[in-house]
Amino acid sequence: MKMASQRFCLRWNNHQSNLLSVFDQLLHAETFTDVTLAVEGQHLKAHKMVLSACSPYFNTLFVSHPEKHPIVILKDVPYSDMKSLLDFMYRGEVSVDQERLTAFLRVAESLRIKGLTEVNDDKPSPAAAAAGAGATGSESTATTPQLQRIQPYLVPQRNRSQAGGLLASAANAGNTPTLPVQPSLLSSALMPKRKRGRPRKLSGSSNGTGNDYDDFDRENMMNDSSDLGNGKMCNESYSGNDDGSDDNQPNAGHTDDLNESRDSLPSKRSKNSKDHRVVSHHEDNSTSVTPTKATPELSQRLFGSSSTTISATAPGGSSTGPSETISLLEISDERESAPVHLPTILGLKIRAINTTTPAQQGSPQTPTKSKPKIRQATGSNNSNSLLKQQLRGGAKDPEVPPATRITGAVTPNAALNAEEQSKEMPKKNQDEVNACIGLHSLANAAEQQAAQVASTGNLHHQLLLHMAANNSMLNTTDYYQQQQQESPSSAGQFMDDDLELLSLNDQQDKSDEPDHEMVTLADENAGLPGYQGNEAEATPAQEDSPAAETATAPPPAPRSGKKGAKRPIQRRRVRRKAQSTLDDQAEHLTEMSVRGLDLFRYASVVEGVYRCTECAKENMQKTFKNKYSFQRHAFLYHEGKHRKVFPCPVCSKEFSRPDKMKNHLKMTHENFTPPKDIGAFSPLKYLISAAAAGDMHATIYQQQQDHYHRQLAEQLEQQNASFDSRDSSLILPDVKMEHAEDQDAEQEAELSDGGYDASNPAAAAAAMLSLQQDVIIKDEIQISPSPSPTPPASCAVAEGKSLALASTAQTAT
């Protein structure tokens, strides 16, 4: 019996992405284009196959008109919208401004663009919900593309709070992990798109054989509770590739979620996605920590807290029925078992140098343990506190027990644990505990106000003003300077007024923390290894020493040992205004200085997005991803009146740098100053006034006239000499002598007056004509680096002498 030969399925995973990129390249190169779209007097070339695949309208049009290269004239369609639609059809994504979104979707609906107007039967399309279309698609196996990069502040605040309330009720009741229905289709339209580590699923390409992975993923998206929540918003106002993420779950099975955490930085507006993801992992072997009320996550970002009342689920995945309250110290241990990567508020990167030891993850800590143990258990929470980023001069990583990390006075058990914990702490730590409790209550009050007022910038400013008013909870120096205090090399280099305000208590805090995170701007990319503290170096005398807050506190002595050898020597710039509240709005703008200019006065930072306040005064909303883009904008558009300019001494053209001005002199004016003369450079060497130029012209003209007058006088002398030689034979000797004397006197008079013979006007006229032909007066001014030479004394014309052609009458002989 003959056995059937085996068949092998060869599949290229990048086939779909390759087709996408190739079609896009062909569009930009205008290769193989077979249709022209005429819009607003302009034309766009495209491929009929792509347009037909993405729009039933174009498909019907091309089938009914089978021309080789048709020209489609689209009336009442803006050119920019049609170009954006082409980008969407070829790439599957497009960026649209908020004010143009409605008109753009209306055009897409009129042209019946797939992914923007249609809704599948099994799953609502977010983009179609935003467009308001109610039609259903015929292709049930194809996943519809989603809109990306739409500004997330289109979602109203009330929708956010309602969705959070539904989530909280579902979590408390112990329901199935499926998500509640969103209160509005617009919110589902603007939910972030899920990114995966595989090619994007294309519409119309499913054949039942090669898309098993895609079908499984799509089915998983419908059954899993992380349907709309596992995504990230590809927002143009945020920078990606940040290591900070909110994927805390240690389950190795969800590799897609772990991969996507490095794709983009989540914003405050994607709060629902984080809540959905926490609810979805009921099958994990770790305790799920779920918030039970819908509040914005300001307190979570500031204090490293993720819950107020905690509901626990069994490891098997089944709910325990009524939500039971876990002790606060158990929550601390649970948080230490999984490293928490909190998202940053202002776009700064946080990197943990080392993690906690496994011995601290086993049994829960009790409130009766010694203070170093409590401090060691709360190291992770201290490192996750974003007060060191958010508040300059605030509580720099204070020693706060776990009771203060979670919203107090919510659960009676939590309040009792907080009181018992506070009794065990010394007096110097009690002040810091009270300070952080006050800050946390302030954050809760601010969150309630934020639910009513949509402006998060006002909330931010109110928090900072409250911090400035209560100096009792603030230390006098910022976290950035305290990092420098640990260095043995820099301890003696930055001894200024700000560093003298460092307290011994802060130094002890830094030395006792087993894990410490880098949040300074200067070192966010450096990866220096010497920032973790050494607990063995802490002595009981240092622990019990009071905090010296006076300006006369001596600087701490430089440390020795392995830590000094491990940390490299690094000089960093220290900000002098440590207690200033005006520039507390964004600490990550510490280094925003271009040539000494304060560019921060033009900026307002809201959730990591830089907005130009100067342009906002003119009703122009300009936002920037990072501070370097804003620096360029502020320097070019708003600092032009204040920056120093270097004008060209010849044409007065302004330059921003002196070397550009000198290069302009060399190239344009054909002039170059040697390097040795740069210090003594004077523009007067290169400028000739109009009066001096007129004097030069007059002097040259007079010199040339005098020269020709002398030549004419010599010719007249020769003629007179020939006449005298002929007449001398007819005159008596005594008369000849007398006539010669008279002739000499007349010659001297003629020479002294510089005149011509009055009896010969024709000669004088001819001489004048020759003078006008030979003398050419140039209108150009010759500029040279050296002073103009003075005319020789022999050619100088005495002042007061006239150049008359005939001044005296000569008697006829």
UniProtKB/Swiss-Prot annotation:
One of its GO terms (molecular function) is protein homodimerization activity. Residues 176-187, 302-324, 356-369, 377-388 have a biased composition (Polar residues). This is Protein tramtrack, alpha isoform. GO terms for biological process: branch fusion, open tracheal system; branching involved in open tracheal system development; chitin-based cuticle development; compound eye cone cell differentiation; compound eye corneal lens morphogenesis; dendrite regeneration; dorsal appendage formation; dorsal trunk growth, open tracheal system. Residues 118-148, 171-324, 356-428, 526-585 are annotated as: Disordered. The gene is ttk. Residues 254-285 have a biased composition (Basic and acidic residues). SMART domains: BTB (SM00225), ZnF_C2H2 (SM00355). It comes from Drosophila melanogaster.
